[in-house]
Amino acid sequence: MDLKQIEKLMIAMGRNKMKRIVIKREGLELELERDTVPSIQEPVFYDNRLFAGFSQERPIPTDQNLGNPIVKESIEKKESEAPAQGDFIVSPLVGTFYGSPSPEAPAFIKPGDTVSEDTVVCIVEAMKVMNEVKAGMSGRVEEILITNGDPVQFGSKLFRIVKA
């Protein structure tokens, strides 16, 4: 059996939707199989730039027809808890927020502090790696929106800044 015959067999398998064929003849054994799952899966990589415009905040479902008081109460509570408008420093990755370099050390920044673009404002731990987060803008820190040790998502608001 030569290569041309094997190619013809492969084409015939495709036309007839055959998954597997085994041929044994005159000391030759040939086994062809289609659409098999690979034994090793390729790793999947995600480009975080694709998610840059997405918000991590979820909309609160409303039930206007039923007048559900729990939903109305949660909407009113959510609106009152919403941080004031302004410029925000956001988390560049998913991890755990730390406001100081160690538990005993003072916080990197506090409300009222002035920051520049290169000022380290916090650390986000991801997979046991401590990643310094820089302000990326100049201004005065108005509010810290998260507490030490809290988990953060990509794009979570960390600090409210009034630009200088």
Curated annotation (Swiss-Prot):
GO terms for biological process: fatty acid biosynthetic process. Keywords: Biotin, Fatty acid biosynthesis, Fatty acid metabolism, Lipid biosynthesis, Lipid metabolism. The modification N6-biotinyllysine is found at K128. It comes from the Bacteria. One of its GO terms (cellular component) is acetyl-CoA carboxylase complex. Pathway: Lipid metabolism; fatty acid biosynthesis. Residues 86-162 form the Biotinyl-binding domain. InterPro entries: AcCoA_biotinCC, Biotin_BS, Biotin_Carboxyl_Carrier/Decarb, Biotin_lipoyl, Single_hybrid_motif. Transmembrane segments: none annotated. It holds the Pfam family Biotin_lipoyl. GO terms for molecular function: acetyl-CoA carboxylase activity. Homodimer. This protein is a component of the acetyl coenzyme A carboxylase complex; first, biotin carboxylase catalyzes the carboxylation of the carrier protein and then the transcarboxylase transfers the carboxyl group to form malonyl-CoA. This is Biotin carboxyl carrier protein of acetyl-CoA carboxylase.
